């Protein structure tokens, strides 16, 4: 099984993330940021990745450090669990609708971190959650999972729906990219022979 556990402690946050890339979507998530917990649940369920995440952060200031550092730590755990990338499909994509909202997410486990992020949220907050933190989460994740990630919210007027379609599509694209292709054997999906 492709599993990993990472603990990351700073002066601002204390975070532990455990992942099972070959899971069933089970999750235990407690970041102290309820909307983030809801979005991480979407990744687990739609990616069929088991997630166990516990975060304690400086929420008395705001949620920025916690959200970003959860992204960083999750990215580190995914990278560790993926390992050499032998046999990996490497690429994944998904379109996900939710009522009026539609998002597209495309992933390449290239070893080169890059984020193309295009969400024009219709409001600045979803409940207590600052929508700007969505980018911070994905930037942290991308930088440490060493993936290229394209996120496009194609339409939507309900900010909750916009965000949820992105996280669901990310989970589904991640599931596709991380699948092992039996025809690949132990080959790495690159002409370089390494990713």
Curated annotation (Swiss-Prot):
It is found in: Cytoplasm. Keywords: Amino-acid biosynthesis, Cytoplasm, Histidine biosynthesis, Lyase. It catalyses: D-erythro-1-(imidazol-4-yl)glycerol 3-phosphate = 3-(imidazol-4-yl)-2-oxopropyl phosphate + H2O. GO terms for molecular function: imidazoleglycerol-phosphate dehydratase activity. CDD domains: IGPD. Signal peptide: none annotated. Its EC number is 4.2.1.19. It comes from the Bacteria. InterPro entries: IGPD_sf (IPR038494), ImidazoleglycerolP_deHydtase (IPR000807), ImidazoleglycerP_deHydtase_CS (IPR020565), Ribosomal_Su5_D2-typ_SF (IPR020568). Pfam families: IGPD. GO terms for biological process: L-histidine biosynthetic process. Pathway: Amino-acid biosynthesis; L-histidine biosynthesis; L-histidine from 5-phospho-alpha-D-ribose 1-diphosphate: step 6/9. GO terms for cellular component: cytoplasm. It is an enzyme of class 4 (lyase). Belongs to the imidazoleglycerol-phosphate dehydratase family. PANTHER family: IMIDAZOLEGLYCEROL-PHOSPHATE DEHYDRATASE, IMIDAZOLEGLYCEROL-PHOSPHATE DEHYDRATASE HIS7. This is Imidazoleglycerol-phosphate dehydratase. It comes from Bordetella pertussis (strain Tohama I / ATCC BAA-589 / NCTC 13251).
